[in-house]
Amino acid sequence: MLKIKTNEISFNIKDYVHLIMGSKKIGKSTLFSEIGRAECGLDKTLCISMGDEDGHQVLKGLPYVNPKNWDEFHEFVHDMVTHPENYPFELVSIDTIDVMVDMAIDKILKEHLIKYKEPCKSINDAFGGYGRGKEAVCRLISNEIELIKQSKYGLFLIGHNKVRPQEDKDGIKFLQLTSNLESQYYNAFAYKAAIICNIDVEQNIGDAILDSSGKQRKAGKLQNSERYMYFRSDGYIDAGSRFRNIPNRVPFTDDPKIAAQNYINAVKEGIKDADEFSGSDEEFNKLAKKDNDIKEEKASKAAIANIKADEDEKRVELFDKFKELLKSAGTKQKNEAVNLVKEWEYTTKDLETKASLEELQQLITILEKDNFVS
């Protein structure tokens, strides 16, 4: 029977998933690194720099890994979660989610090719079409985020923003500064995030010069610009938070250390309001430390349990596929597979319960060879 629990507000900002959007080269990766420096130290801050992203290159001392495809990313995340003793990090970023989506799409297209023996024209056509390909991409993304979310690591998602035309339920069209991603992919991240921060540059333009007919003859001159981190949507800027009274916006200053502190203070203000906390900063930090210790102790166990459940489900799927292929495979392929099973000293039942996922996949690869010999 389900146990009823009473929710407690965590004072640890690492307990919340953060999504930060901004234009290219505005300083998103730098902001994350400085938040990490302030909260846990740079040596405990990890950037997962996806594919060709290189925001980490100018950040001296920032630990990073650079997975080039989905399998590398997936394997690293699973190892990081199942063996936390090997990874001394407290904060992790995925930089960027735009490239993460590209990797996930490539992965699903490859899975479609393996299953159907022919490529599909686009992700829309994968697995029979009707949106199944995109749904599979979103599931991949959601599963990885959930693993990290339930582990000891605090997660920051870094992405690009873009002005997009939108339309409300009444058909009214408007422009919005939102994610660069398609809405379905963006929502896979946004629904997991407790804080969505959107960085915007506000430019102050001097008066334009008009001719006698009122038409602009000379463009206005840029007087200055100011950058802000938005935590609340204003209709044009897409942002949001589960904290009711987090500030609408705070300055994104040229000094990255100050900008990071502005971000941290804004989140802490939201936490304090949600908990109706009125104590000192010292008391807040003690509670945050306590919540962080609880997260480290409990979270990895939950993530490991999830991974085991995923592996059990995958094992059933691979074993069923192995049995189907065995029925139609040629003699040469069957013999090669059987000899390998004997070499491993497995019985058929062992294959279903003890064989690793890699071993089952190896057998499937043998049986899928095209050069059948009857």
Predicted regions and their residues:
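Interfaces that engage single-stranded nucleic acids at replication/repair/recombination sites
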Residues: 2, 6-22, 26-27, 46, ...
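Conserved P-loop
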Residues: 2-3, 7-94, 98-103
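Short, well-ordered beta-strand core segments
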Residues: 45, 155, 196-198
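Generic beta-sheet signal
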Residues: 48-50, 158, 199
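Conserved nucleotide-binding/hydrolysis micro-motifs of P-loop NTPases
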Residues: 51-55, 97-99, 161-165, 202-205, ...
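Structured loop/turn residues at beta-strand edges in well-structured enzyme cores
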Residues: 87, 151, 191
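P-loop NTPase motor core
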Residues: 98-184
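Conserved GTP-binding G-domain of TRAFAC-class P-loop NTPases and closely related GTPase folds
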Residues: 167-303
